[in-house]
């Protein structure tokens, strides 16, 4: 395949990339208003060191914990047979149904002892590990056991075999998961604010809320952007260059699932049961508890208010997910099939944007809509654009995993027959990666249903979503009033999670 993409594809990815530059432009413009002397004072004060330490510790610990837990769970479930396996294959995806800020307030309502560093790390890890479990599990299902058999036949130990024969094949899934989880932890707001853990994002929100100081908030965001650039470079180095599809003759030989001994089955069952109880059991039980015994339930509003919040969440999330996936497709296709500096950097631009807190992205859209498109201010259109900016990397990660597993030989055949690249993509490539497209849509839709920060700022007072309703009531310690909205959010989020597990990651 040629390294230079077709002109129409180049133009398309540039048009997609242009609006992604707005938040960067906003951050630079507002950060320069602080002035050099004031910037030095802010960046080198003790408070900044504390925020940097807290943010980096949260990102590193949660990423390591979520990747380790997700990979270990995927390996056990794909390689071994034990009682309860079928249930836990589904149960390990269910934490995606529960927003991190909902988990936070349910744990806080149970015990205030979680308002410590390790409590925050634990809750965020339990909320994030399915983002590693799903893609790693999908790759383990498709691995050829020939490499492992060759390694073992040469006298290598199982540990050596896993490290040098299996783990390199998991690099794409693990690398994408590291990037996704790490960047998400950099900008997490709802859960860490409920758990009273101070990070750059909470400081940015406080600067805006208490002093309406957009310039200082932009300066703090610039620090996050610098950290993000390092993470993106690290992910590119970690991923490396390797062929991920089966290119030889013959068929892939799947792994044989082994049955564990009774003692090991008991240990494995206990391990998965503990994860299920901590990640799903406690939040759901506490929601039901507050629904039954809470005294603030009457503050939740009538059924019409509840229905309005649900319909707003569904419509905005659906449109946002559709736009995001449609824009992610050409970016990923260009980066994977037409590797060049232009396609790679436009493909990585959304990941850099992911390090900008949703609050700052929302502020940039408020600024540009007020000054240049006042009629669009506080409309669904601006919210959908914000969603596209926030969750484009999530769609890219899922689509990339599908496209990299597809050999480009079929596209070369189409090209040799004189077909143009768009026809080849529409008739050959797209149908082959439809499960990945469905996975991307479901994953983005799921996260948009739970999105809080940008939605808080961009919606007008007469527009309420499920996540906003939960936030408003929990901020006033009205846990019972928040429960109906939180339960609806959890139950409805189960639909895309079911689709992800059943059709996309298999």
From Swiss-Prot:
The chain crosses the membrane at residues 9-29, 57-77, 90-110, 116-136, 174-194, 218-238, 275-295, 314-334, 350-370, 379-399, 428-448, 480-500. This is Fe(3+)-transport system permease protein FbpB 2. The lineage of its organism: Bacteria, Pseudomonadati, Pseudomonadota, Gammaproteobacteria, Pasteurellales. Belongs to the binding-protein-dependent transport system permease family. FbpB subfamily. Changing residue 167 to F: In strain: TN106. Changing residue 104 to C: In strain: TN106. The complex is composed of two ATP-binding proteins (FbpC), two transmembrane proteins (FbpB) and a solute-binding protein (FbpA). Changing residue 72 to L: In strain: TN106. It is found in: Cell inner membrane. Keywords: Cell inner membrane, Cell membrane, Ion transport, Iron, Iron transport, Membrane, Repeat, Transmembrane, Transmembrane helix, Transport. Its main location: membrane. It is a multi-pass membrane protein. The keyword Cytoplasm does not apply. Part of the ABC transporter complex FbpABC (TC 3.A.1.10.1) involved in Fe(3+) ions import. Probably responsible for the translocation of the substrate across the membrane. Residues 52-233, 310-500 form the ABC transmembrane type-1 domain. InterPro entries: MetI-like, MetI-like_sf. Changing residue 116 to G: In strain: TN106. GO terms for cellular component: plasma membrane. The keyword Ion transport applies. One of its GO terms (biological process) is iron ion transport. PROSITE patterns: ABC_TM1.
